[in-house]
C-alpha cells in the first residue's frame, strides 16, 4: 500500500466522516454497561472484553498472552497472496481466522511454530461467545496491544466470515529471510511498501521469541517488552556482542544485551538502505510510532476483507495507559552509549540519547503462556 494510496484513503475517510457525521451521531447506541458505541452490534463485545481481560490477559496485562495474541494477528492476516490467485491457485484468505479454524495444518507451518499455544488459549473464548475466529483474532490483538502502555487507540472492525480452507504454506515471512524476500512478500499480501514493513515491525516493541532458540523461551526483543515504545528501534541498532542462549540458531544474530533476542530479519531491515532511515525515525518519536502502527494494524486486520462491509466497533477497545514518565521515550540502556550505535541511515544522524545509570542492563525472560 503505497503512501500515495494512504493519503488518498485518509482524504476519502475524512470526506465520508464529514458527510455522514450527523447520521453516525443518530446511530450511536448505549449498551447495558452504560457505554456509548457507534453501532448497537458492538455492545456484545464488551462481554468478550471483560472475559479475555480477566481470563486470557491475566487482569489486562501486557504479558506473554498479549504478545502472542498480537503475533497471531500478523501470522493469520499476512497469509494471502494475489500473486498465487493470478496463477489460478488459492492464495489464502488473509485475516479470516484460518490459523484457528485449520490450526492442525497452519500451526505446523515452520514460521507458525509455537502459535498452537495461543490458538488453544483463544479457542474456548470463540466458542463461548459465538464470534468468528477472524473477528476474535483481530479483537484479541487490539485489546492485547491496548494493555501495553504507550500503545495507540486501537481500531477494531467486525464482519469477517469464517475461513473455508487453510492458507497455503510459505506466505509468512521467516526471520532468516532476506530483506528482498520480506519486502516482496508484504507487497504481494497488501501492496505494502518497505516503509510500511517497518511500521509492522513496531509490534516487536512488545514481543518475545519462544522458539528461535530451542534451549530458552521468553526472550524479549528489547529491554522494555511491557511498554509500546521505541526502545526496539534503538536497541536493534546497537552493536551485537553475544547470544542470550545457545547461539547459532537459524534466524538469530548477536544482540547487545544479556537476555535479549535479536532476529536476523530485524537486524537486516534496520541496516538496509531502503528501510534504515524509517527505522531510525521512530527513535524518540512516540507520536510517529503510535500513528503509524495504528494505521498498519487496521490495514493488516482487513486484508482479504471489504472494509466497506465491516462494522466499526473500535469504541469497545480500551485506551492504553501512557508511557511511564520515569524514563525518557528513548534511551541507551545502562552500559551503552552512542559509540555502540551502528549508524545505518545516511540521511540524518542518530538522535542524541541519555544513557540510563547503573550496571549493564540485563533483560529478564518473559514467562511463556501455559503449555508453551
Curated annotation (Swiss-Prot):
The task this protein performs is described as: Depolymerization of lignin. Catalyzes the C(alpha)-C(beta) cleavage of the propyl side chains of lignin.
Q: Name one GO biological process term.
A: lignin catabolic process
- EC number(s) given by UniProt: 1.11.1.14
InterPro entries given in the database record: Ccp1-like (IPR044831), Haem_peroxidase (IPR002016), Haem_peroxidase_sf (IPR010255), Ligninase (IPR001621), Ligninase_C (IPR024589), Peroxidases_AS (IPR019794), Peroxidases_heam-ligand_BS (IPR019793)
Query: Where is Ca(2+) 2 annotated to bind?
Result: 205, 222, 224, 227, 229
Give the region (Disordered) as residue ranges: 352-372
Where is the sequence biased in composition, kind Low complexity? 352-361
Pathway where this protein functions? Secondary metabolite metabolism; lignin degradation
In terms of Pfam families, this protein maps to: peroxidase (PF00141), Peroxidase_ext (PF11895)
Site residues, Transition state stabilizer: 71
* SUPFAM superfamilies found in the cross-reference section: Heme-dependent peroxidases
* Position of the signal peptide: 1-21
Instruction: Indicate which residues the UniProt annotation says bind heme b.
Output: 204
Catalytic activity from the UniProt record: 1-(3,4-dimethoxyphenyl)-2-(2-methoxyphenoxy)propane-1,3-diol + H2O2 = 3,4-dimethoxybenzaldehyde + guaiacol + glycolaldehyde + H2O; 2 (3,4-dimethoxyphenyl)methanol + H2O2 = 2 (3,4-dimethoxyphenyl)methanol radical + 2 H2O
Q: What is this protein called?
A: Ligninase LG6
Q: Does the keyword Oxidoreductase apply?
A: yes
Which residues, in ranges, are excised as the propeptide? 22-28
Keyword annotations of the record: Calcium, Cleavage on pair of basic residues, Disulfide bond, Glycoprotein, Heme, Hydrogen peroxide, Iron, Lignin degradation, Metal-binding, Oxidoreductase, Peroxidase, Signal, Zymogen
- Please provide, alphabetically and separated by semicolons, the GO molecular function terms listed in this UniProt record: diarylpropane peroxidase activity; heme binding; metal ion binding
Which residues are reported to be glycosylated?
285
Binding-site residues for Ca(2+) 1, renumbered to this chain: 76, 94, 96, 98
Amino acid at each position: 500500500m503505497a503512501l500515495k494510496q494512504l493519503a488518498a484513503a485518509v482524504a476519502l475517510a475524512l470526506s465520508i466522516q464529514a458527510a455522514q457525521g450527523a447520521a453516525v451521531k443518530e446511530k450511536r447506541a448505549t449498551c447495558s454497561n452504560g457505554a456509548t458505541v457507534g453501532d448497537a452490534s458492538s455492545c456484545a463485545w464488551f462481554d468478550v472484553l471483560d472475559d479475555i481481560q480477566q481470563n486470557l490477559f491475566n487482569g489486562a496485562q501486557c504479558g506473554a498472552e498479549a504478545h502472542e495474541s498480537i503475533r497471531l494477528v500478523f501470522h493469520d492476516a499476512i497469509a494471502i497472496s494475489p500473486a498465487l490467485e493470478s496463477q489460478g491457485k488459492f492464495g489464502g484468505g488473509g485475516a479470516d481466522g484460518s490459523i484457528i479454524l485449520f490450526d492442525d495444518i497452519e500451526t505446523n507451518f515452520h514460521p507458525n511454530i509455537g502459535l498452537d499455544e495461543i490458538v488453544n488459549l483463544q479457542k474456548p473464548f470463540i466458542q463461548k461467545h459465538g464470534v468468528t475466529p477472524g473477528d476474535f483474532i483481530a479483537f484479541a490483538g487490539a485489546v492485547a496491544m491496548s494493555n501495553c502502555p504507550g500503545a495507540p487507540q486501537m481500531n477494531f472492525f467486525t464482519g469477517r466470515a469464517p475461513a473455508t480452507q487453510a492458507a497455503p504454506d510459505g506466505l509468512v515471512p521467516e526471520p532468516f529471510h532476506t530483506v528482498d524476500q520480506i519486502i516482496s512478500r508484504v507487497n504481494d499480501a497488501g501492496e505494502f511498501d518497505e516503509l510500511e514493513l517497518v511500521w509492522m515491525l513496531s509490534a516487536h516493541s512488545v514481543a518475545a521469541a519462544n522458539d528461535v532458540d530451542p534451549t530458552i523461551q521468553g526472550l524479549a526483543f528489547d529491554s522494555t517488552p511491557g511498554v509500546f515504545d521505541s526502545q526496539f528501534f534503538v536497541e536493534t541498532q546497537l552493536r551485537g556482542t553475544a547470544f542470550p542462549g545457545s547461539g547459532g540458531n537459524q534466524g538469530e544474530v548477536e544482540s547487545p544485551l544479556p537476555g535479549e533476542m535479536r532476529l536476523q530479519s530485524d537486524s537486516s531491515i534496520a541496516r538496509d538502505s531502503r528501510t534504515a532511515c524509517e527505522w531510525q525515525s521512530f527513535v524518540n518519536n512516540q507520536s510517529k510510532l503510535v500513528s503509524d502502527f495504528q494505521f498498519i494494524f487496521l490495514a493488516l486486520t482487513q486484508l482479504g476483507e471489504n472494509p466497506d462491509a465491516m462494522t466499526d466497533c473500535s469504541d469497545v477497545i480500551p485506551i492504553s495507559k501512557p508511557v511511564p514518565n520515569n524514563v525518557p521515550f528513548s534511551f541507551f540502556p545502562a552500559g551503552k552509549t552512542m559509540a555502540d550505535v551502528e549508524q545505518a541511515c545516511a540521511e540524518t544522524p542518530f538522535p542524541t540519547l541519555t544513557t540510563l545509570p547503573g550496571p549493564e542492563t540485563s533483560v529478564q525472560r518473559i514467562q511463556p503462556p501455559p503449555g508453551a
